[in-house]
UniProtKB/Swiss-Prot annotation:
Residues 36-285 are periplasmic. Residues 55-69, 178-187 have a biased composition (Polar residues). The lineage of its organism: Bacteria, Pseudomonadati, Campylobacterota, Epsilonproteobacteria, Campylobacterales. It is found in: Cell inner membrane. GO terms for cellular component: outer membrane-bounded periplasmic space; plasma membrane protein complex. This is Protein TonB. PANTHER family: PROTEIN TONB, PROTEIN TONB-RELATED.
Length: 285
């Protein structure tokens, strides 16, 4: 296999060859220069001018002087130095500087409003000593007058008429009938409960029951059936309207009557669930 020479070897060979060629050229040139200096210069060649001298040309001293004087080179008149004319200064061109753009005037800042000075708190004035003035008790003149009138009525014998007696008897009979009717109706709703217990419950409710004025003005009547539970400790719970044939005004009045009369109910031996009808009527006796 052929091995190609390395690039380093090739570069060395090329440099050596170039050195030898340059050395040979310098040697040839130097030899030519030496040979040219040793060669004699040729005589005047054709076309050269001959210089001839005659004796007549030699004159006396005067001539020599004149010749010498003439030989002297004429001094050229010195040139007067030219006055340097003052250079006219060229008028400088006024460079007009560009006018600066007017800066926009800053907008005047709004002056901050002066904060209102806090008003000095008024010093608390010393409270004037309040002299305890005994309030004059209102005169009990009207009460005394009422008491006198009652005393007169008591002292004066009442004239009882037969009509009044009849009315009182009718009222008692009607109240007995209503109580009997109420107890009988209550017994119908509460079987197994004693009449005495129911009577106490009804009397307590009637003592706290109020006929609402709004219902009276509107002429509202009706009956509300209320159920509730009396516990052994005397507390009353689960109060609600079971049945009603009237408006919410009387329903609310019936519930309030049970709540306000609860503390008057007798304590049962065991927990009792009751249903009590409460009637509202505008009929006069």
């Amino acid at each position: 296999m052929k091995i190609s020479p390395s690039p380093r070897k090739l570069s060395k060979v090329s440099t050596s060859v170039s050195f030898l060629i340059s050395f040979a050229l310098y040697a040839i040139g130097f030899g030519y220069f030496l040979l040219r200096e040793d060669a004699p210069e040729p005589l005047a060649q054709a076309g050269t001018t001959k210089v001839t001298m005659s004796l007549a040309s030699i004159n006396t001293n005067s001539n020599t002087k004149t010749n010498a004087e003439s030989a002297k080179p004429k001094e050229e008149p010195k040139e007067k130095p030219k006055k340097e004319e003052p250079k006219k200064e060229e008028p400088k061109k006024e460079v007009t500087k560009p006018k600066p753009k007017p800066k926009p005037k800053p907008k005047p800042k709004p002056k901050p409003k002066p904060e209102p000075k806090p008003e000095p708190k008024p010093e608390p004035k010393p409270e004037p000593k309040v002299e305890e003035v005994k309030k004059e008790e209102p005169k009990e003149e009207p009460k005394k007058e009422e008491a006198k009138e009652e005393a007169k009525e008591k002292s004066a014998p009442k004239q009882v008429t037969t009509k009044d007696i009849v009315k009182e008897k009718d009222k008692q009979e009607e109240s007995n009938k209503t109580s009997e009717g109420a107890t009988s109706e209550a017994q119908a709703y509460n079987p197994g409960v004693s009449n005495e217990f129911l009577m106490k419950i009804q009397t307590a409710i009637s003592s706290k029951n109020r006929y609402p004025k709004m219902a009276q003005i509107r002429g509202i009547e009706g009956e509300v059936l209320v159920s509730f539970t009396i516990n052994a400790d005397g507390s009353v719970t689960d109060i609600k309207v079971v049945k009603s044939n009237t408006t919410d005004i009387l329903n609310h009045a019936a519930l309030e009557a049970i709540k306000s009369a609860a503390h008057l109910f007798p304590k049962p031996e065991e927990t009792v669930h009751l249903k009590i009808p409460i009637a509202y009527s505008l009929k006069e006796d």
